[in-house]
Regions:
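Membrane-interface helix-coil boundary segments and nearby low-complexity
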Residues: 1-6, 225-227
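Structural motif corresponding to alpha-helix initiation and N-cap regions
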Residues: 12-16, 57, 187
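Active-site beta-strand/loop signature of hydrolases that rely on acidic residues for catalysis
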Residues: 4-9, 18-41, 63, 98, ...
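Structured beta-strand-rich core segments of catalytic domains in phosphoester-bond hydrolases
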Residues: 29-110, 114, 199, 205-208
Length: 231
């Protein structure tokens, strides 16, 4: 079993909350979005920085428990750019992943932090980004189970998205409560998880912090999800 918190820090504003979040019981990893990667510490509590994006003004990062997991490799990736990326803030890297080995069970896995294009882009672009991210993580993991957690910026038509990712062997799992409430017409589940080779046991929306997004806690067990078994 692995327990991961994902949090969009809202332009790094919520960075000071990470020390307390890292104290979450039995927490194994953190996936961050909208952080200033150059200012991230190497350690947050007992979590170690696996990797972060390098070229973004606001980037992504993955932390993991070094006593529980061994890091095999990691990499950040560019995805198809939205108009927002081309005109405004440079955000070429929207995915960072780390291949880990569970020291207890021997399982290999890929853990990734993902941030899709903003709401000014079309859902079709975000679907292309998600599909490309899944393919890149499969290459990184060489067939290892995948957890891709983050800000998908996909509050509407999620059932359609779930059907599409299922066709490629992934499960989409929302949290128990919505994760974004800043905009009246775009409240909902922005932050969630897509996975392959895991059984998602729980996705809990945690208490609100200073970000416009609310952190989520994913609890997952090793084992094929229903979409893979049915394939």
């Amino acid at each position: 079993m692995i327990r991961v918190i994902s949090y969009n820090l809202r332009k790094n504003r919520a960075i000071t909350e990470l020390v307390e979040l890292a104290k979450t019981p039995d927490l194994d990893a953190l996936c961050l979005q909208e952080c200033i990667a150059s200012e991230l510490p190497a350690e947050i509590g007992n979590l170690h920085l696996a990797d972060s994006t390098k070229r973004n003004r606001l980037g992504l990062a993955v932390y993991y428990r070094k006593d529980r997991y061994e890091q095999v490799s990691s990499r950040s990736f560019e995805l198809k750019k939205s108009l927002h990326d081309l005109i405004f803030s440079p955000t070429p890297e929207r995915l960072v992943g780390a291949k880990l080995v569970d020291r207890k069970s021997g399982h290999e896995l890929v853990l990734a932090s993902f941030h899709a294009a903003p709401l000014t882009a079309l859902n079709s672009l975000r679907r292309k980004q998600i599909a490309a991210a899944h393919e890149l993580l499969q290459e990184l993991g060489s067939g290892a189970p995948i957890l891709m957690i983050g800000d998908y910026n996909y509050p509407l038509f999620q059932e359609n998205l779930s059907d599409k990712v299922a066709k490629s062997g992934y499960d989409l799992t929302l949290s128990d409560r919505r994760t974004y409430t800043a905009y009246k017409f775009f409240r909902g589940h922005f932050d969630f998880v897509t996975s392959q080779g895991f059984t998602i046991q729980d996705v809990e929306t945690l208490p609100r912090g200073s970000s416009d997004h609310i952190p989520i806690l994913v609890t997952a067990g090793y084992g094929a999800p229903s979409s893979v078994e049915a394939a």
